From Swiss-Prot:
Name the UniProt record assigns to this protein: UPF0149 protein KPN78578_32810
Matches recorded under InterPro entries: YgfB-like, YgfB-like_sf
GO cellular component: cytosol
PANTHER family, per database record: UPF0149 PROTEIN YGFB
Family to which this protein belongs: Belongs to the UPF0149 family.
Residue intervals passing through the bilayer: none
A Pfam family: UPF0149
Amino acid sequence: MSIQNEMPGYNDVYQLLNQQGVGLTPAEMHGLISGLLCGGNTDSSWQPLVHDLTNEGLAFGHELAQALRNMHSAISDSLDDDGFLFQLYLPEGDAVSVFDRADALAGWVNHFLLGLGVSQPKLDKVKDETGEAIDDLRNIAQLGYDEDEDQEELEMSLEEIIEYVRVAALLCHDTFARQQPTAPEVRKPTLH
């Protein structure tokens, strides 16, 4: 991945969203953009969709718009690389509790499903493995926890859920966004 398409810093995006009065976390914004991309929205229409869904249709200021374009490019690059580089964008560090990460995951999944649904309006009709994964994501979006739970155990469970969500997002991308191989064009013989 080129330097130009690196993911902007989580705290930087958080500050830019707050400055613009956008009521989303960086995890939620990443989930929304990921959902749009995994749903097959690969053209520039993603920007007005994000404006409509998050900012009452108003464009963002230059700095936030640039950070989100960088985020979009980085997500797109990571998905196009067979998904090996694709990761959920969640807060990290010693100051971030497992509960904060669980809340961020639930927000990421909710907004991923929103973006996916905007790109694929008949999402409830999807069957097979992808349909099951989408149903699982709906359940994960309702994620709850008990603050009295063992934090180490919760952290391990959370990491497993994060990996499952990552794989489910990649499955959606493979289903909706990958170019399906087409049959070779059949030409009718030409009569001379």
